[in-house]
Amino acid sequence: MTQLLSARAGEITPEMEYVAKREDLPVELIRDEVASGRMVIPANKVHAAGALEPMAIGIAAKCKINANIGNSAVTSNVGEELEKLHTAVHFGADTVMDLSTGKDIDNIRRQIIDKSPVPIGTVPIYQMLEELGGNIEDMNAQHFLDMVEHQAKQGVDYMTIHCGVKLEHLHLTVNRVTGIVSRGGSLIAKWMMAHNKQNPLLEAFDDLCDIMREYDVTWSLGDGLRPGSIADASDDAQFAELDVLGECTKRGWEKGTQVMVEGPGHIPLDQIQMNIERQIEVCHGAPFYVLGPLVTDIAPGYDHITSCIGAANAGMHGAAMLCYVTPKEHLGLPNEEDVKQGVIAYKIAAHTADVARKRKGAQDRDDALSKARFAFDWKEQFRLSLDPETAQRYHDETLPQDTFKSAHFCSMCGPKYCSMKITEDIRQMAKEKKLVELPTT
């Protein structure tokens, strides 16, 4: 039984109970959202029996973030990837994808799954291509089915599979500025061009569902034709694929499998709401998992910023999970520090989306930190911040002594120009002179 089938049968699984506590929501609501397909609980039966702490992705839950790690053909090793995993989870990643494309993929993934408390996602075509010697033209559907089953047996919780790219879509990409930017999408496109046949992953969809259902692997329907520049945003190729993903969503549900859908990409700020609403309609409310989106293309080295602007907007309008972008995007393989910066940027984006959507308790931490700020409780401010070490380090750069951790000013304004200290003085004066009736707190 998958989480979806259990929910449809009216059953409440241990994973649903765990999620309900984490989300502070009624367990019956969790069950009903999973049953409807609006929520997924990525929990491969193998991983669920090990280190996994179940979580939920869906419009009724808090907005989640994913961090990508993984080696490449030219850099990184098992130790570095495990350090990235630890950093990502420590700073708040809700899921992690292992996108390794280099050597030792199996060993890296096995160790990541063994040590990860969060769901692990993969793109199976990467390892399959490595085992085919890099020649996608040599692939057949059975190669892919075997790889999906192999990774499912290892405990992978969700898989990005590019079923939506069709042969008849490819001509729609000819005039794009950046063409096909999805690695998986471009590989499938190349295979279709070489063989003049339809997408073999789409043809094998029902067989893939059988594997996903056996291990309760969640579909992450890949957007192989996502725009890779704002010039290509919201074009015919993107939306032609989206229509197919909507059909695949229903087919996946009919087969008893959990489904979420991936989205763009590079989208101007004014088009984000339309994109989210269109996806929700076309894909029947399935959780939307977006990469960014980046809202401008002119800031290599700062794309964690260009993208978290779009991500916050996407989350506010209904995206259920945000895939982080690091400062290294478009430039190179992220290191541990890049992972940290990407996760923090996206925790900010997801949190602001939760506040905007008025999710239960979302603003409590903001209010607590604001009260600590007004009370000049520096240690409490550090504790409540997303990155306490950095917050304290910045304060220590100019006022390192312990005495300044109780001072009623910082180095920005000093003791005479602090507006909050002046406000404190005004309130005290008003009390003494009884100019206004102030409530006691």
Curated annotation (Swiss-Prot):
Catalyzes the synthesis of the hydroxymethylpyrimidine phosphate (HMP-P) moiety of thiamine from aminoimidazole ribotide (AIR) in a radical S-adenosyl-L-methionine (SAM)-dependent reaction. It is an enzyme of class 4 (lyase). InterPro entries: ThiC (IPR037509), ThiC/Bza_core_dom (IPR038521), ThiC/BzaA/B (IPR002817). Its EC number is 4.1.99.17. [4Fe-4S] cluster binds at C410, C413, C418. This is Phosphomethylpyrimidine synthase. NCBIfam families: PRK09284.1 (NF006763), PRK13352.1 (NF009895), thiC (TIGR00190). The lineage of its organism: Bacteria, Pseudomonadati, Planctomycetota, Planctomycetia, Pirellulales. Belongs to the ThiC family. Transmembrane segments: none annotated. Pfam families: ThiC_Rad_SAM. One of its GO terms (molecular function) is 4 iron, 4 sulfur cluster binding. Binds 1 [4Fe-4S] cluster per subunit. The cluster is coordinated with 3 cysteines and an exchangeable S-adenosyl-L-methionine. GO terms for cellular component: cytosol. GO terms for biological process: thiamine biosynthetic process; thiamine diphosphate biosynthetic process. It catalyses: 5-amino-1-(5-phospho-beta-D-ribosyl)imidazole + S-adenosyl-L-methionine = 4-amino-2-methyl-5-(phosphooxymethyl)pyrimidine + CO + 5'-deoxyadenosine + formate + L-methionine + 3 H(+). It comes from Rhodopirellula baltica (strain DSM 10527 / NCIMB 13988 / SH1). Keywords: 4Fe-4S, Iron, Iron-sulfur, Lyase, Metal-binding, S-adenosyl-L-methionine, Thiamine biosynthesis, Zinc. Substrate binds at N68, M97, Y126, H162, S182, R183, G184, D223, G224, L225, R226, E262, Y289.
